[in-house]
Amino acid sequence: MSMQDPIADMLTRIRNGQAANKAAVTMPSSKLKVAIANVLKEEGFIEDFKVEGDTKPELELTLKYFQGKAVVESIQRVSRPGLRIYKGKDELPKVMAGLGIAVVSTSKGVMTDRAARQAGLGGEIICYVA
C-alpha cells in the first residue's frame, strides 16, 4: 500500500513516539523529511537525526524531553496533498504568538517562519510546531 502523505506520517510518528516516551523514531527517508528534521533540530524540538541505508534510506529522529515531558507540545500538518496552503511574506502566521514555529518550504529551501520573514520570502506552510 502506498503512502498518500509522507509528511503527515512523519509528524504522526513524532507525536506518537513522544506520547509513548520513545527515545527515537524511524521512518523512510526523503530530502524533504531531512530538511524538516534539520529545522526541528535547529529550533531545539528534537535532539538529533541521522539517515542510514543506501538502497532504502531510513531517517532516525532522536526525540527530546525536558524534565520527563516531551518538548513538542503540538505538531500539526497544515498544507496537505489535497489542499496546498501558500502564504506570502506578509501573510506568514505566528504560531502561539511567536512561541512556536511554522515550517515553510520556500524557493530557498525549508526554513522557519521567522527566517522566511527575515529573508522576505513566502512559501508553502508545511506544519506548525509548538
UniProtKB/Swiss-Prot annotation:
Entries under PANTHER family matching the protein: 40S RIBOSOMAL PROTEIN S15A (PTHR11758)
UniProt entry keywords in alphabetical sequence: Ribonucleoprotein, Ribosomal protein, RNA-binding, rRNA-binding
Function: One of the primary rRNA binding proteins, it binds directly to 16S rRNA central domain where it helps coordinate assembly of the platform of the 30S subunit.
Family: Belongs to the universal ribosomal protein uS8 family.
Recorded GO CC terms: ribonucleoprotein complex; ribosome
Annotated protein name in UniProt: Small ribosomal subunit protein uS8
Quaternary structure note: Part of the 30S ribosomal subunit. Contacts proteins S5 and S12.
PROSITE patterns: RIBOSOMAL_S8 (PS00053)
Alphabetized GO MF terms: rRNA binding; structural constituent of ribosome
InterPro entries the record matches: Ribosomal_uS8, Ribosomal_uS8_CS, Ribosomal_uS8_sf
GO biological process: translation
Sequence intervals crossing the membrane: none
